[in-house]
């Protein structure tokens, strides 16, 4: 289940995250390494090492077959509409990097990534090795589908792919991604969005509660949290589609579309 990487000595690189909160969450390292296949912003060392405080012992370029890069993870309307996921799709492939990290780092990563599901996958390293990895995938929500990422987010993927020397055709694909073109919201529109937060979250309570209760009945506490969050996201974007998109434009889908 957990693949063992060939770690370099770790003494020179502390896994202590910058904040005390992270330190308490990851107080000790078990020494057991996990190969984590990443394809999104965690390709970029400014995010993975800098923001998340991870210290990978190895980073191996590879391809995951049978999965496709998709921007189906809901973000913040009109600001950061969509994030990346690897979605199972026959005949597709997704390029990325297998990071060797400790079990504690992996558990911290999963906890902080929100509503992703964990799956075990087999990756083909560029050097010919077969790697058993763990990766994160996200369900496609009916009210969200897939949308364009922000330029900021797409740039993280592009820079990360170049940093790790990913396939040139893959980099060209990332360079060709359409990015979300933000719309200028007036003061009234901004106020309406802000005032809608509370009622929208209240409207999501029944669906989120039912989803959480169903998963809790199986004893899966983390799954219950994820299911509740996913249902909340779907309601939020349902409100966005029904009420705000006709007035302010569809966040994550440019006007020309």
What are these regions (language model features)?
Residues 13-20, 24, 28-257:
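Glycine-aromatic micro-motifs
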Residues 1-12:
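N-terminal chloroplast transit peptides
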């Amino acid at each position: 289940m957990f693949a063992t990487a060939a770690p370099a000595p770790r003494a020179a690189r502390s896994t202590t995250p910058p904040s005390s909160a992270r330190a308490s969450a990851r107080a000790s390292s078990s020494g057991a390494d996990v190969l984590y296949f990443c394809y999104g912003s965690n390709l970029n060392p400014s995010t993975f090492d800098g923001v998340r405080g991870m210290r990978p012992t190895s980073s191996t370029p590879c391809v995951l077959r049978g999965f496709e890069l998709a921007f189906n993870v809901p973000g913040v309307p009109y600001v950061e509409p969509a994030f990346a996921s690897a979605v199972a799709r026959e005949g597709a492939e997704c390029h990325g990097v297998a990071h060797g990290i400790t079990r504690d780092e992996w558990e911290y990563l999963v906890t902080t990534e929100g509503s992703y599901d964990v799956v075990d996958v087999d990756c083909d390293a560029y050097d010919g090795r077969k790697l058993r990895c763990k990766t994160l995938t996200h369900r496609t929500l009916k009210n969200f589908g897939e949308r364009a990422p922000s330029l900021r987010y797409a740039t993280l993927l592009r820079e990360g792919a170049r940093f790790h020397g990913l396939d040139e055709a893959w980099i060209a694909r990332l360079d060709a991604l359409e990015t979300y073109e933000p719309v200028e919201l007036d003061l009234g529109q901004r106020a309406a969005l802000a005032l809608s937060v509370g009622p929208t979250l209240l409207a999501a309570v029944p669906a989120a509660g039912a989803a959480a209760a169903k998963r809790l009945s199986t004893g899966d506490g983390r799954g219950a949290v994820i299911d509740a969050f996913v249902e909340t996201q779907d309601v939020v974007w349902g409100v966005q589609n029904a009420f705000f998109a006709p007035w302010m434009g569809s966040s994550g889908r440019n006007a020309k579309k």
